[in-house]
């Protein structure tokens, strides 16, 4: 690892520490107005909040609540989830900025290291102290974790861009898809990264033309449609429909149809991954794997169904 890479990594973590310290010192001690009390209460006992449910936020919030020494401290520790997620977003903002700054400053500039790291520091600290971001960083709302996933996903796009010609670069695309799927369990804001992924893939792999850009934008629209119209509403519909058929028409036990639907999705995904790999269709193999990991990340919504069956006090 060269000196720039080492300093870049260290400075990123320094930005994380500064942001986390600021947010911890200014953290809400309990709960604030609007949805924060609902999210904190639901995360504490893994209950079900208003649709669509934010299950990943609630499950991670539950882990943070375990650090509370008393029930009075639960709100504080779930707020700490937002502080940690926001600090992570600041760290990735630093690395995203230095990635671009390194390519903008000439190599023969004697002050390149200072300029690049300085640009990243300014961007990271600006993000740290900007008003709306700071507010979401100190309360138990979903926007902090959503911002973290957005920054992480965009950083992963840049990592793929840098390694696109390497043998194992496609793993970054699969990782991006998984992060998008996980982010659905927090907020749909992360879907805004999908057009960026499609355009980055086009600009990195193909000659740039007007028609090519139009096709790349069309592909991003199809990817958004897949998530918003097939994955998001389609999987619950498939589970409910198959369960109704298995129970009402075939006389099977409750949830047998839902289990069959999950097995069907896994079997179809495994077959398509195996088929595209064996036939040498590399691009299609990556597409199938990415689609599967979006669905896999989205599976956090099973928590909403499972916990709702327990009839918790908060069950929206």
Regions found by a protein language model. Name each.
Residues 1-22, 88, 112-121, 261-297:
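Start-transfer (signal-anchor) and selected internal transmembrane alpha helices
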Residues 6-33, 127-129, 187, 225-230, ...:
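Transmembrane signal-anchor helices characteristic of membrane glycosylation enzymes that use polyprenol
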Residues 13, 80-109, 152-159:
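Transmembrane-helix motifs of polytopic, lipid-linked glycan transferases
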Residues 26-28, 71-79, 104-113, 120-147, ...:
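Aromatic- and kink-enriched transmembrane "portal" helix at the membrane-lumen/periplasm boundary
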Residues 27-39, 49-61, 314-316:
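Extracytoplasmic catalytic/substrate-binding loops of multi-pass membrane glycan-assembly enzymes
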Residues 43-73, 80-84, 91:
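Short hydrophobic/aromatic helix or loop-helix immediately within or flanking a transmembrane segment
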Residues 101, 106-114, 153-173, 199-210, ...:
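Membrane-interface transmembrane helices that cradle and orient dolichyl/undecaprenyl
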Residues 118-121, 156, 163-181, 210-222:
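Short hydrophobic alpha-helices at membrane interfaces in multi-pass membrane enzymes
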């Amino acid at each position: 690892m060269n000196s720039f890479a080492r300093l870049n990594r260290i400075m990123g973590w320094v930005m994380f520490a500064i942001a986390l310290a600021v947010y911890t010192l200014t953290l809400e001690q309990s709960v604030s107005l609007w949805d924060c009390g609902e999210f904190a209460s639901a995360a504490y006992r893994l209950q079900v909040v208003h649709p669509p449910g934010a299950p990943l936020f609630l499950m991670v919030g539950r882990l943070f609540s375990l650090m509370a020494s008393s029930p009075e401290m639960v709100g504080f520790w779930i707020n700490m989830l937002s502080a940690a997620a926001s600090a992570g977003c600041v760290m990735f903002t630093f690395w995203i900025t230095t990635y671009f700054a390194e390519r903008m400053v000439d190599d023969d500039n004697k002050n390149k290291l200072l300029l690049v790291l300085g640009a990243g520091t300014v961007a990271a600290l600006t993000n740290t102290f900007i008003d709306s971001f700071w507010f979401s960083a100190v309360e138990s709302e979903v926007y902090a974790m959503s911002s973290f996933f957005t920054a992480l996903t965009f950083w992963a796009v840049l990592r793929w861009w840098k390694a696109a010609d390497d043998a194992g670069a496609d793993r970054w695309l699969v990782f991006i898809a998984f992060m998008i799927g996980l982010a659905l369990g927090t907020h749909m804001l992360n879907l805004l990264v999908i057009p960026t992924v499609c355009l980055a893939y086009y600009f990195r792999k193909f000659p740039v033309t007007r028609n090519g850009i139009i096709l790349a934008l069309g592909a991003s629209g199809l990817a958004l449609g897949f998530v918003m119209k097939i994955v998001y509403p389609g999987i619950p519909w498939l589970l409910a429909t198959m369960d109704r058929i298995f129970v009402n028409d075939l006389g099977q036990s409750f949830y047998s149809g839902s289990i069959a639907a999950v097995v069907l999705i896994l079997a179809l995904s495994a077959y398509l991954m195996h088929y595209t790999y064996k036939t040498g269709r590399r691009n299609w193999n990556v597409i199938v794997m990415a689609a599967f990991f979006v669905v896999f990340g989205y599976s956090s919504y099973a928590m909403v169904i499972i916990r709702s069956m327990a009839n918790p006090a908060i069950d929206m």
